[in-house]
Each structure stands twice: as structure tokens, then as C-alpha cells.
Amino acid sequence: VCSSDLKIRSFVHGGAQERSRRAGTENIPGIVGLGAAVERAMRIMDTKTRKEIELRDYLIGRLENEIPHCWLNGHRTKRLPNNINFSFLFIEGESMLIMLDMKGICASSGSACTSGSLDPSHVLLAIGLKHEEAHGSLRLTLSEESTKEEMDIVAEEVKKIVQRLRDMSPLYEDFLKSQKNN
């Protein structure tokens, strides 16, 4: 919606269609096709979303129950249906990412807009995580093609990798010693 006084220059020249703003005949088959595609997408979107939420929550549950000293970042349910972000104490996210990549598992340690950066996620810092907590973060993104079997593989590999990295961590060793002394 714009003022009738506003002068809009045509970006496709050659005719007076569309009040001289766009020359040519509308692509009716394309318009109908787009409408049909949108209708189909709307019909299956709820099913896809429910599946992603089910898989997301399943993987969250496995990670929380099977790996000590980790937590879900962000709200449990008010999040994208395909997004998981965890922090793991006593490890560096970059090391975890390299090891996951070697297993064929795609992940990131920050937001999609900062992938490739070695700095901790500014979003995680903004929601109150400490620098070292944000550095030990892992972001996983599911898709409509993700399966429960893949979630099991991811959970098992993350569990093994976290344990292997903690076994090498002097911070984790100090933590375990302090727990024995208490």
C-alpha cells in the first residue's frame, strides 16, 4: 500500500500493464502452481513440525539423561522445532566439532550466522552463560528427513566424544578430585 502521489518507475519495460509498472502478461500457470505448492506445504507443515519436535525432544532427553554436567540452552519448548543447543562443561566446543565431523555428524558451536567463528556465541553470552560454558556449546539442527536411528547415533557419539575430551581435560580432573574431597 502506498500513496497515490508516489511515482514508481517500471522495472520491466514494454507495455502499460499493471498501471505501467510492469510490462507483460502475468504468468498464470506459475501463479496457480505457486498457490498449489503453498496449499500443499501448509497441509504437511504440521506433520513435519510434530515429527521434528518429537525427534528433538527425544535427543534432548538422551543427552540430558546420559551425559553429566550438560544442559539445554534456551527454552525447552519455545524454540524452533528442529533446533538443539547444549553446553557441556569441561570441554571445548571446537574439539567436539572436529570429532563429530570425523564421524560424519554435522554440528556447530554457535548460531548459524556465526558459524566458522572461534568466539563463543554472543547469543549464549547474552542469555547469561559464562565464557567457558558458551565455549563448550553444541548446536544441532534436524530436518524433516532426520530419523530416530540417527538421533540414537548422534547421542551415542556425543556421549563418547564428551567422555573422551573430559578424560583429557585438566579442568575435569580437578573437578573430580574436588568431588572426592567433599
What positions do the PLM features span?
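Structural signature of PLP-dependent enzymes
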Residues: V38-G61, W71-L80
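Conserved C-terminal alpha-helix-loop-beta "cap" of PLP-dependent enzymes
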Residues: I84-R139
